[in-house]
Amino acid sequence: MKEKMNKIPVFYACDDNFVKYTMVSLQSMMDHASKEVQYEIHVLHTNISEEMQKKMYAMENANFSVQFDHVTEYLHSVQEKLPLRDYYSKTTYFRLFIAEMFPEIDKAIYIDSDTVVLGDIAQLYAYDLGDAYVGACKEQVMIQEEVYGTYVEKVLGVERDNYFNAGMLVINCEQFRKNHVLEQFMELLPMYNFVVTQDEDYLNLICHNKVCWLPQKWNVEVFGQIPCREEEICVLHYIMVSKPWHYSDCRLQEYFWESAEKTSVYAEIRQVLESYTDEERKRDAVSCDRLMQMAKDEIAKENNYLNLVKAGKLKSKDRQITTIVNITEISIKIVCKASVHTMVLIPPLKV
């Protein structure tokens, strides 16, 4: 690895509406960081205002630097292909560009903005990933919610306890580049439109069997049963609609507000909570129901992703696709004009 332990690159991705929550996450990270380490904070964006950038720059200190990185050039090639849904925005795809945008970086942390960091992120960065593409934690929604667990097994072909949440990743940028992860994503994108967890599904397919599983304390989702003791939590993740700035009874919201109070956007965030209407909360409930129905519909589809691959019916007008079946995996060999590589799209299947 090129980076030294005393200089850690950390990436967020957000827009102008969400950057205030990024600031809360960053504040919590700073509160628990080592004074012996330098942290380089990158914010990937397309439209954050100068006013909000100034507020975040003001958070810099002797150990933390902040820079805003515009991703328009990298987003342009996929903009028309990105399927959007409800609370998803194009920012969710930005993490895929990190390795290519920053060729000098061999390892980086990506973290969602709807998080609170309660441990030293340097300890997370210190994990040896080996040749894994990412270090990640298991997605608890897939493990604890039957519909979503069935979805990943019947639509993606990934066992529910081998599916990771992409809201906190230690990215092995060197392996991303070496194994053309961004290129694989771009090849998968037009082949099948994943509508449930979108880029998280693509990442789980591409990175299957190339994951360094990290202790669950590094991505504790506010959902169902918490997989560790509260005092052990290092990263708290307010997933889906469970946002403390929308719900005063959000579980574990006290950690968010403790950090929010220290930021220059505290009053603004409190106003968001106070002005969030019952109608908006109803829409949240509808959104959750709709997402679950999408998962059920995908499971029931005859031409869902897994069924198409099994039948050898995935097609792309720009490339020749051949299915290769053996007892351990189904692979798709993609023969392009410029290169030939094999992309493992379906993991080992139980029969």
Describe each model-derived feature in a short phrase.
Residues 108:
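Short aromatic/hydrophobic "clamp" motif used to bind/position activated sugar donors
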Residues 59-100:
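Active-site-proximal specificity loops/subdomain of glycosyltransferases
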Residues 111:
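Catalytic metal- and UDP-sugar-binding loop of GT-A-like glycosyltransferases, i.e.
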Residues 115-148:
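Conserved donor-nucleotide/metal-binding helix-loop-beta segment in metal-dependent transferases, i.e.
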Residues 1-14, 166, 171-323, 335:
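A glycosyltransferase accessory/donor-loop signature
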Residues 87-88, 157-161, 192-194, 226-227:
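Short Gly/Pro-enriched turn/cap motifs at secondary-structure boundaries
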Residues 28-37:
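Short, acidic, metal-binding catalytic loop of nucleotide-sugar glycosyltransferases
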